[in-house]
A protein has these predicted regions:
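Bacterial N-terminal signal peptides that target proteins for export
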Residues: 1-7
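Hydrophobic helical h-region of N-terminal Sec-dependent signal peptides
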Residues: 8-12
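C-terminal motif of bacterial Sec signal peptides marking the signal peptidase cleavage site
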Residues: 16-19
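Bacterial signal peptide processing site
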Residues: 21-23
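Extracellular mucin-like PTS domains
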Residues: 27-31
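Metal-dependent phosphoester/phosphodiester hydrolase catalytic core
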Residues: 38, 42-403
Length: 403
């Protein structure tokens, strides 16, 4: 079987990209452009990476450049987990769990802990845990309730169960905050990867449901209300500060999709004012090199758009470690690069730090170790000077036609 390549050289070439704008108005940043990446101008002598971990998890070294980052989502603890052979064969420096890492859906924390114990007993997961550093965020099913938000009554207890399972020390400051959001910066100057793991559950307001007889896809409309929140005030303030820290590549892990907006299921576009705020926060911080990683959808795809921010937005969705739909995906997504992946798979980012701007080889790899998506991103396209030039980084009209 040949890999399902994205549109020929779609990401490595100069792109023409459909915009990500919604029906809200976003204020333009007054920050002036510079010719140099913000990271180079603000670099401190050293930045600590992840805190220590416990319970047999592997620490993430602070000073080692990351060259292979694997990630995935939607892993049912009671089903076969044959994907781990392919993950371990890829030998990643880090694995990121992007949510729905177990399916608990419960307010009973004894049940929640039992579900985590079932995952811990899986041989493939045990091998990963013993050999590979792991970072994780949650989505609704490991949060505790399908499509849940801020009103879940057991969210504080669920947070404790999450942090306990994923090896976060009992004296960590992460146990004092409301929500599991977290960030690390790894690697030496010039090869620094920032990984920001958002919590899209703990503070999220209710979504707006579409009446059953009016649905053409998922159940959620765009809620045109600037007062609602996805992240909550404290997490927003934290994110703004994190994005000001110097880094050469930034991965923002969101359990739900950031770019795709047509399907009607949970997505950032369901709260369009918050989605615009996300792009604006990146722009205000002058944060270059952002790639979104997402899950939730039970299929894989890469979505690309011009966005309301200063350069194109790339969202790599890997969803279905063992919960993929197992069929051809016909769902419309006019931001999609290439084809969607309906088989169980994981995402793999391979970073080449040799060029002035690193390149990121993006693959979605199935259980047979076949790359069903395979393309390379030149991160120069994720810079302010590129986005503000004549490269269609901001106001393009077509996703299908690279220049």
């Amino acid at each position: 079987m040949q890999p399902r390549y994205a549109i020929a050289a779609l990401l490595i070439a100069t792109l023409s990209i459909t915009g990500c704008t919604t029906n809200t108005e976003t204020q333009t940043s007054t920050t002036q452009a510079t010719d140099q990446p913000v990271a180079a101008a603000q670099a401190p002598e050293a930045i600590a990476a992840a805190e220590p971990v416990i319970n047999g998890f592997q620490p993430l070294p602070a000073d080692k450049a990351l060259t292979k980052i694997a990630f995935g989502s939607c892993l049912h603890q009671s089903r076969l987990q044959t994907i781990w052979d392919a993950v371990l064969a890829a030998d990643p420096d880090l694995f990121i769990f992007a949510g729905d890492n177990v399916y608990a859906d419960t307010e009973d924390m004894a049940v929640m802990r039992g579900v985590y114990s079932e995952l811990a007993a899986k041989p493939g997961f045990s091998k990963l845990k013993a050999t590979t550093p792991i970072l994780a965020t949650w989505d609704d099913h490991d949060y505790g309730v399908n499509d849940g938000g801020k009103d879940f009554p057991q969210k504080a207890k669920s947070q404790k169960a999450f942090l306990d399972f994923w090896g976060v020390p009992t004296d960590s400051s992460r146990r004092d905050r409301e929500g599991i959001y977290h960030a690390v910066i790894v690697g030496p100057e010039g090869q620094r990867t920032q990984i920001i793991l958002l919590d899209t559950r703990y503070h999220r307001d209710d979504l707006e449901r579409i009446p059953q007889d009016q649905r053409t896809g998922g159940p959620y409309a765009e809620k045109d209300d600037p007062s609602v929140t996805m992240l909550g005030d404290r997490q927003w303030a934290w994110l703004a500060e994190e994005l000001k820290k110097p880094a050469d590549l930034r991965l923002i892990v969101s359990s739900i999709q950031v770019v795709a907006n047509e399907h009607g299921w949970e997505r950032w576009a369901a709260l369009p004012w918050e989605r615009d705020k996300l792009f604006q926060t990146i722009e205000d911080a002058r944060a270059e090199g952002v790639i979104f990683l997402s899950g939730d959808r039970h299929h894989g795809e890469v979505s690309v758009c011009g966005g309301t921010g200063p350069y194109m937005s790339v969202d790599v969705t890997s969803s279905g470690l063992n919960q993929a739909r197992g069929r051809t995906i016909t769902e419309e997504n006019h931001h999609r690069a290439g084809e969607a992946v309906g088989d169980n798979h994981f995402g793999l980012l391979t970073i080449d730090w040799t060029p002035e701007y690193p390149t990121v080889h993006i693959q979605l790899i199935d259980e047979q170790q076949r790359a069903q998506f395979d393309d390379t991103l030149d991160t120069k396209k994720l810079t302010f000077t590129y986005g503000e030039g004549d490269h269609h980084g901001r106001h393009s009209q077509s996703v299908a036609n690279p220049e």
